[in-house]
Amino acid sequence: MNKVKMLSDVVAEVRKEAPEDVPNWSKRYEEAKQNLQNQIMKGRMLPRGVEDHPLADFGFNYSVQRDVRAGHVMNIMRKFDPRVCCPVSAVKRSDSNTLYIFDGQHRAVALALLGYEKIPVTIVETDEPAFDAEAFEIVNDSGILRAGTE
């Protein structure tokens, strides 16, 4: 039995079934699309590509981030497979070269402990002062960007 489905087929299924499965789907879907258009009008786009940066470039904003848990880091290292290691996500402000990780701090610590000198990262460049807090909340409350290794 073939368990593979193409993205376009799954999207079509969701479009068909969601109005019955999700309360107020149509209204909420239109609101989400309008919200995206508003974000794009403000110049907010998807991050582009992945870059490798040295460990010294990264920082954690602990007014936003949770403390690193050594047990969680060990769990990542114990199961580590580089083929499924997603890049960390970080914000870069124009007044600093520091990349503030908002998703993947445990992954970053695990990579450093395993001997990596550079870490793959997707960077969001913004001067919005609360962006890393907002991004952390979005990622952790909605599951967006969650990786199986994190």
Language-model features, listed with the residues they occupy:
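Amphipathic, charge-rich alpha-helical segments that serve as recognition/docking helices
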Residues: 122-150
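Short alpha-helix boundary/capping and kink motifs at helix termini
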Residues: 2-102, 106-113, 117-125
